[in-house]
């Protein structure tokens, strides 16, 4: 496998640096060459830049105020850097650089939309209220009727009330509710259109793990309209859902809208039986639930679905790294901390041109050769998580990555910032240690050691302050204090020291996943999230995040929440 990935890495470098793209005159040359002439071709060398320049001029003329003009960039007239394409790792998709900015990529937007607009609400507490407080009978037939009512109401349609204004179905066609349960008998009694079938969506072994964890409980997977969460925020998701749940219970079970039991149903939907994707952030960061800063690394690992469809532990982890770098670096930190150009090329370093993949699969072979197949799928084959093991694997991984950069200067040119290289080297080391040990915090330890080895070798990691969390992070891998020593799976973007710097969080998420994909676990932290997103009806395919980003870049991805129905046609 490592040889195949190495060949793919070299092909990505050749596509990027030895083949002409647009009119960048990159044809010929050698990906191991150490010198290259700067041709100073300017932004016009690239087709997408030409399109953007043309659009900028037209918009400026139309609105009468200056707009996009790349010559305002002090470096653009020199045109020193060749504008080269990116190959999406794990695919053959070749993309324009600008098309990997999340603003220009509908798939990236939809990935976050699909997470932000989702919540999970238990049904059992509501059913107990109906039965014990109101004497109502709850049967598969009444549940089916309730779900039919709810799928009418959830997009924003009226029940119980008189003829109210409603949302147009064509604007909210991505909104729906399904249920799932660990009770096969109940699942068989519910109309199949409303059920996420655990036995169908997961392998037999994974389904058994999930059903054992969920037990006889029943849960609603709720996806409110994309257009609603885009207009409001992530905290609106549970409020919107709770309102429609309450109205649907009243209608389906012929309740009196003003009776006291309605308050219990409301409390269950809004609080007691609610599972949000992300936690609320503290006041200084001022974000409600279901915003990126509160989405833990373990939750993201469970949202990504590659583990359902692949038995390759490294690939499963790398898909989470890609999804995490896009979400945490491009959308969260890239807007919250930076804005504008953002941090796109921090993230692309981890999911393009197969550089991280090449390092990781080298590590897999190294581990399997030295530790008797410890990086293969399984639980009995793992090596004990000791400092000696972490030192060995992380050092070998980092040195291989450094040597690859030095052997292929094109890879250095691709990852032109030291902090990009730091991310990739450390992510490979951390994922490798987690795969070998089945222990995510051993993976974190490998990450931090990689940073030390990298800095010792090259003298720096990235821009000033980039390495702050990496210098102090090792002390907290096994700290007894809860806020410092959390398992990696429970950490997130707002964990102490993680909240300030780009280029880290996607790697931490991949490490969390690697510990469990290496073991073949059905989920990382929460089986409810794993099942909720095991649904082919969702616009974004969470089984292949990197490929979806590529489809977005080449403009093949169809998003939800568009407003074309209610705006003038161009």
From Swiss-Prot:
Binding-site positions, coenzyme B: 239, 270-271, 284
Keyword Metal-binding recorded: yes
Catalytic activity reported: coenzyme B + methyl-coenzyme M = methane + coenzyme M-coenzyme B heterodisulfide
SUPFAM superfamilies: Methyl-coenzyme M reductase alpha and beta chain C-terminal domain (SSF48081), Methyl-coenzyme M reductase subunits (SSF55088)
Localisation per UniProt entry: Cytoplasm
Pathway listed: One-carbon metabolism; methyl-coenzyme M reduction; methane from methyl-coenzyme M: step 1/1
Disulphide-bonded residues: none
Post-translational modification: Is methylated on C5 of Arg-285 by the methyltransferase MA_4551. This post-translational methylation, despite being not essential in vivo, plays a role for the stability and structural integrity of MCR.
Chain residues that bind coenzyme M: 346, 464
Broad EC category: transferase
5-methylarginine sites (modified residues): 285
Cofactor(s) recorded in Swiss-Prot or TrEMBL: coenzyme F430
The keyword Cell membrane belongs to this UniProt entry's keyword annotation: no
Its EC number(s): 2.8.4.1
Alphabetized UniProt keyword annotations: Cytoplasm, Metal-binding, Methanogenesis, Methylation, Nickel, Transferase
Cofactor binding note: Binds 2 coenzyme F430 non-covalently per MCR complex. Coenzyme F430 is a yellow nickel porphinoid. Methyl-coenzyme-M reductase is activated when the enzyme-bound coenzyme F430 is reduced to the Ni(I) oxidation state.
Any one of the GO BP annotations: methanogenesis
Any one Gene Ontology cellular component term annotated for this protein: cytoplasm
GO molecular function, one term: metal ion binding
Residues the entry annotates as binding coenzyme F430: 161
Subunit and interaction comment: MCR is a hexamer of two alpha, two beta, and two gamma chains, forming a dimer of heterotrimers.
Family affiliation: Belongs to the methyl-coenzyme M reductase alpha subunit family.
Record-given protein name: Methyl-coenzyme M reductase subunit alpha
Natural source organism: Methanosarcina acetivorans (strain ATCC 35395 / DSM 2834 / JCM 12185 / C2A)
Gene designation: mcrA
